[in-house]
């Protein structure tokens, strides 16, 4: 668990370094910015919540790859964006993922402005292709997690505990006994 936490903290610094380096910051400034992001108060204070740390690890990669796929209209960065969103969805806190989607929406509007509507109307096919590719890559990678979530959704009860029947169903399955030998 400690190695995983350190891995996520390191990944947040590496992602921020690549993001800052892409915008042609001096390497020392990019290194300083990535160390500041990696060791910011949120990461240090939230180290006990691993999924929050995972969110900070993959957020710079999502922003960098999305920026590059919108500005360069490259299939490679579109696939990277879908995969980065998958990592964020699969590892981070769910609210962080939703906030990131809103952030990407505003980021898209900012990148395609000042003539937002005229730019969207004139290039709508390319933007639609980019976003459909991102969605397809994201869904293909996330499909096991989505199916697992949908299967476990009926078993979740908010505000009340699990009933006795649900708690005792398959309590001593043979596959669970195998964990005793490990």
Please provide the spans of the model-predicted regions.
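Short, intrinsically disordered/low-complexity patches at protein termini
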Residues: 68, 122, 170-171
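Membrane-interfacial, low-structure loops and terminal tails that flank and connect transmembrane helices
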Residues: 114-127
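Periplasmic/ER-lumenal interhelical loops and adjacent helix-loop junctions
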Residues: 127, 135-182
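Membrane-embedded helix bundles of polyisoprenyl
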Residues: 4-6, 10-23, 27-114, 130-149
């Amino acid at each position: 668990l400690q190695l995983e936490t350190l891995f996520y903290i390191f990944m947040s610094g590496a992602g921020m370094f690549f993001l800052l380096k892409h915008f042609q910051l001096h390497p020392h400034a990019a290194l300083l910015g990535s160390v500041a992001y990696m060791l910011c108060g949120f990461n240090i204070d939230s180290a006990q919540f691993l999924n929050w740390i995972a969110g900070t690890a993959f957020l710079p990669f999502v922003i960098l790859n999305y920026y590059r796929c919108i500005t360069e209209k490259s299939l490679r960065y579109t696939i990277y964006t879908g995969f980065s969103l998958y990592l964020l969805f699969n590892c981070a806190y769910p609210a962080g993922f939703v906030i990131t989607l809103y952030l990407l929406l505003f980021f898209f509007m900012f990148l395609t402005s000042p003539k937002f509507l005229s730019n969207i109307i004139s290039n709508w096919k390319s933007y639609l292709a980019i976003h459909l590719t991102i969605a397809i890559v994201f869904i293909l990678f996330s499909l096991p997690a989505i199916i697992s979530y949908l299967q476990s959704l009926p078993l979740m009860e908010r505000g009340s505990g699990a009933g006795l029947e649900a708690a005792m169903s398959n309590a001593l399955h043979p596959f669970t006994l195998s964990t005793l030998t490990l």
